Amino acid sequence: MASLSLKNVCKVYPNGFEAVKDFNLEIQDQEFIIFVGPSGCGKSTTLRMIAGLEDISSGELKIGDRVVNDVEPKDRDIAMVFQNYALYPHMSVYDNMAFGLKLRKVPKDEIDKMVKDAAKILDLTPLLDRKPKALSGGQRQRVAMGRAIVRNPKVFLMDEPLSNLDAKLRVQMRIEIAKLHQRLGTTIIYVTHDQTEAMTLGTRIVVMKDGVIQQVDTPQNLYEKPCNLFVAGFMGSPQMNFLDATVEVAGDVANLKIAGHSIPLPPAKSKKLIDGGYDGKVVTFGIRPEDVYDSEMYIEASPNSVFESTIKVYELLGAEVYLYFDLEEFPVTARVDSRTTARPGDTVRFALDVEKIHVFDKDTEQVITN
């Protein structure tokens, strides 16, 4: 197994387009690292540079203690699993998994043991004699993973491996990949645009935008302490609500003025706004849907953060409901208990959990209060 180090790594194409800009990251042995971001953010390009499928324009890439910028992909001791399974249709599952080992002229008895061991891990043993056309999408993806496992690489690279699966299979395969990481104890770098995969699988997540790292952190910290407006809006579904408000300082309390209301912030958040000289300035504040309440008990406990609005849309998702309404010109989503009596057209009171408010600079979009 191995650690990885990327120092000042850049990718510039001949037309001058910078796909990856000054990428710096230290990955520890056995970590499960997720690269996440919107399409075109540079996450797959970075993975391909690690794999050796894209040249590094500048910077240094180390796998273990070895600089591998100019090392051929086959000599980097990595294995890739792609979005497309790329299985040989005329070969059995066994032969698909064994093919790379045969090319490397590994002894036949070793190949047999490695393939059967990997098949056992992935629950493929009953399927070893089948052809890919007789397999489900999830089974085919497990075969693709098995083909990577038999190589016993130092690092697994996975490029959106679940994108071609339906929703139910994606959930099942997510669990399988998590179990696989626990069993193998190997380093995994995983690319996805799906934040659910990122939050559930990663030990750390690298959020990217326009080829630049926005934040590297644990899933919980990314969710609870986003460093800027982009990360706050990208992580979480439904996404964080964003509203503009004017800061008004009274003594040692900073208030957010919006829709005729003045929301007093807790001491720590107030201090950061006051120390930053935000009195009288317009800021953007964010609140997650689950921190917007319609229960009377919470409303009575938080009288200074109560708003009234008319429900526009009601979405029932079993145990919870999404309520959509406006606060001035800003759309707001609340995630509430399914036992709510609120329905479209109803005027409802809501309270915000002021402890969970995030305040961002209007110009730089950097967080002020975390």
Please state what every model-predicted region is.
Residues V36-P38:
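The feature captures the beta-strand-to-loop junction immediately N-terminal to the Walker
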Residues A51:
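Helix-to-loop junction immediately C-terminal to a conserved catalytic motif
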Residues E54-K62:
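Conserved post-Walker A/P-loop segment of ABC ATPase nucleotide-binding domains
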Residues V253-I311, T341-N370:
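Glycine/charge-rich catalytic "coupling/switch" loops of P-loop NTPases
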Residues G16-E18:
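Short coil-to-beta microelement around the adenine-binding A-loop and adjacent beta1/P-loop entry
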